[in-house]
Amino acid sequence: IATSAVRTAENKIEFLEKLSEQSGWIVKVITGEKEAELIFKGVLLAIEKFEQPSVILDIGGGSNELILGDKKEWLWKESQPTGMARVINRFSLSDPIHKGEVKMLQDYFTEAHKNAFTKCKEKEVKTLIGCSGAFDTIADIIDSINPGEKQRRTQVIKLDEFYKVYETLLKSTREERLTMKGMDFVRV
């Protein structure tokens, strides 16, 4: 299956034809809604059910999916074209990033995902479930291990641990991030 990057590519048809021609694969391009649904099903394989309303976040390159779930059901889902590859291409950011740029990005994501924030407030969500490589990288930095060294099904990241990594990343240059224990080079 193909997701956001192919969904919105100008050369989508040519790309899919070439891929099929060279590999023999028939690739189905799924909607953002279907992507969110599959993410939810994958999370349920890992945690079985939510003890309280929770929001799932998948940070992708082309899109971010947010799914509000409770028990074993999703209540609401969205897919927005706010993935990190798109953000990097859209905004010119300093190295290290400046405080004003952080605020600009916070405003951008808040506006793009305002419906998600509203739904989370309505359901009094207190738990974020991350299910992408970005969250694996945060966990690897916290655990001070090399990327892929630890295979995890789940891992709780405490808020203070997250903010410690967050502050470190904000203050660091690209070169410094490349040498951080746990940092996956594709996430620098």
Predicted regions and their residues:
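Helical "lid/coupling" subdomains associated with nucleotide-phosphate turnover
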Residues: 3-53, 68-71, 76-188
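Conserved catalytic-loop position in the HRD/HxD motif
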Residues: 58
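Acidic, divalent-metal-coordinating active-site segment for phosphoryl/phosphodiester hydrolysis
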Residues: 62-68
